[in-house]
Amino acid sequence: RLLTEPRVIIFYITLLFYPISSRLTLLHDVEISTSFLTPWTTMPAIACIVFLVFLGFYIARKSPLISFSILFFLLNHLTEGSLVPLELIYEHRNYIPSMLFFVPVAIFLLKVIDHFSYQKSVQRLITALVVFLLFAQGDTAFSRNALFAHPLLLMEDNVKKSPNLSRVHHNLGSVYWTNGAYEKACQSYENALRFNRHINKTDVAVTLHSLGMCRLYAKGDPDSAMAYLQSAIDVDPSYWPSYKDASICLLQKGSIKEAAEKIRTALTMWPNNSELHEAFGLILLKTGKYDQAILEARRAIAVDPRRYSPLTILAEAFRKKGDIGLAVAYWEKFLEKYPDNLQGNFALIELYFVQNNRGKLFRTVEKLTTLKRSRTWDEFMNDDIDKMAPAAFSPDREKLLEIIENAYLKRS
C-alpha cells in the first residue's frame, strides 16, 4: 500500500490537470506496486512526492501561500496514503485536497502575463488559451454528469473502464437486478466471481450471496442457491444477509427445522436486526406458530418502526387465527405504504370477500385490472404470484379468479 499510494497521488494530480472523461470513473483498477521497481513508475512517483514535500518546506518563508497550497494538498491525502486500510483510490478524495491546488497555478499565470506586459498580443493569447481550457473542462464536466442520469449508465461506463474489477461487475448486476433484468444481473454476478478481483472478503461474500439470490429467485434452484449462500457464510460470517436468505432458502426447500436454526444463530449475533426478526416471524408463520410469529413481527417493527413488511406477517397470522378485522387493518396499513403491492391486494380481495365488503372488493379488483394492463388474469397471476415467494400470504389462484369474476358479474 505504501508503495502504491504515491502513484495514486500523482494520478490525482494528473486528473486535475487533464480531467478528460475517459480518465474519470467511479472505481479505478490500480496496479499494485510490489517493489520499488515494479511497476517502474513506483520509484519516480515516490521521488516526486518527496520533492514536493521538500519544496513545500523550502519555499515556506519566501512564498508562504504557495508552500501552504502544496502542503495542504499532500496533508489531506496523508490518511489514505498511510497504513490505514482504505480502498486505494476514489476520485472524491481529491475534492478537499484540490481546494488550493490551483492557487500556485494562478500565481504562475499572473506572473507570466505580467512578464509580457509590453506584448499585448502575447497576453491576449495566454488569456484566450486559459479561457478555452476552462470552457473545455466545462464540456467534460457536462458530458460526465450525463452518466449520472441513471445508475445503469454509470455502472456500464465503469465496467468499460475497469473491466477486470469484480466490484464493478457486481455493481452493474445490482442495477440490472433492481430494474428486473435478472438474467443480465446473474451474468454480471458470475463475471464478478470469475474475475476474482475483490477488494476484501466481504465483497466476495456479497457476490456469493447475490448469486444465491439468482439461483433461488431467477433460476428456481434452491439447492444451488443454498450452496452459494453457505459459501458466503463461510467466507465472511459477519455478513448477516447470507444467514437471513439461507434460512428463507431452507424454508422453500421444506427444511423448516434447519431454517429456524439458521435464523436463531443469526439472531444470537445480531439481536437487534429487524430483518432477521422478520425472517424468523415468516418461518414461524409458515410452521403454524402464529402467536410466536406475531411476537417476532412486532419485535421487527419495534427495532425499526420504518419497516412495513412485518405488517404482512401480522396480517396473515391474524387471518389464520380467524381475526379477519385485524387482518384487514394490517393489510390496509401495509398498502398505505405500498399501494401496488400484489401480495397485499390479493390478500384483501379474499378478505373483503369474506367480509362481504363489495365496495372495497371491487375497488381493489379495479386497481389490479389497471396493473395487469393487457394481460389476462391467468398471465398476470402466473407472472407475478410466483415472484412473491416466499411471502406471508400465499394466494389461491383458482379462488381469486372466481372472486374477481363474481365481482365483475355483481357490479354489472
Regions found by a protein language model. Give the residues of each.
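Membrane-interface amphipathic/re-entrant loop segments adjacent to transmembrane helices
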Residues: 1-60, 77-98, 106-114, 136-167
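Helix-start (N-cap) detector for alpha-helical repeat units in TPR-like alpha-solenoids
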Residues: 166-167, 200-206, 240-241, 274-275, ...
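Membrane-interface junctions at the ends of membrane-embedded or membrane-associated helices
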Residues: 105-129
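Terminal, low-structured helical/coil segments at or just beyond the last alpha-helical repeat
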Residues: 360-412
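Structural marker of alpha-solenoid helical repeat scaffolds
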Residues: 161, 195-199, 235, 269, ...
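Position-specific recognition of the canonical hydrophobic site in helix A of tetratricopeptide repeat
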Residues: 177, 209, 216-217, 244, ...
